[in-house]
Amino acid sequence: MKKLFNFNKKTIVATCYGVVLFTLFFRYVKVPTGFPEVSIQTAYGIGAFFAVLLGPIGGAFVAFMGHTLSDVIQFGPPCWSWVIASGVAMYITGLASSKLKVEEGEFAIKDIIIFNIYQVVGNLLAWCLIAPGLDVVMYGENALYAFEQGVWATLPNIVSVGVIGSVLLGVYFRIRGR
């Protein structure tokens, strides 16, 4: 089994790049959904790409720090319930890295399916359970509203990761395989 994270210069630098890209995309490249405080976040496609390259711990760190920095820039204090959920979603997505052959440059239909199974599970858990559950516990949010907001966030995040993440990984694997 692959390591959860390789602590070396290359992965530390790549993680920092991931945090910066995630922050910028999370803050500036999003599409409103019509539900309050829920957008189609292109950043999760970027986060998933880094999660597969760096492993689950690197992916969780990219999303956790990127979401935190974006919230601090935009609002002041971060919404910790959603920041934690971002980290969990990318941690679970990053678990797919042990099933994919990143270094060999292979990314076939089977690999796309495996990647998307992991990201769907991660997004469902993060946005349908963790974020709304923590909203209720940490902030005293109305449970119905919190879980409805979580459900509204789930599908756009699944689509964002499914499309953007799959395309980025496909391009990376093609280039890497040469």
Feature names for model-found ranges:
Residues 53, 95-101, 170-176:
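Structural signal for the C-terminal ends of transmembrane alpha-helices
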Residues 1, 22, 97, 110-111:
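Generic N-terminal initiation segments characterized by hydrophobic and/or small/turn-forming residues
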Residues 1-53, 57-61:
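Hydrophobic transmembrane alpha-helices
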Residues 54, 58, 62, 66-69, ...:
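Short, flexible micro-motifs
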Residues 50, 69, 96, 134-135:
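Broad structural signal for hydrophobic residues in well-ordered alpha-helices, predominantly aliphatic
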Residues 23-39, 64-97, 148:
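Interfacial aromatic-anchored transmembrane helix boundaries in multi-pass membrane proteins
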Residues 29-41, 75-81, 104-178:
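Membrane-embedded alpha-helical hairpins and interfacial helices in multi-pass inner-membrane proteins
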Residues 14, 18-22, 47, 51, ...:
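Alpha-helical transmembrane segments in multi-pass membrane proteins
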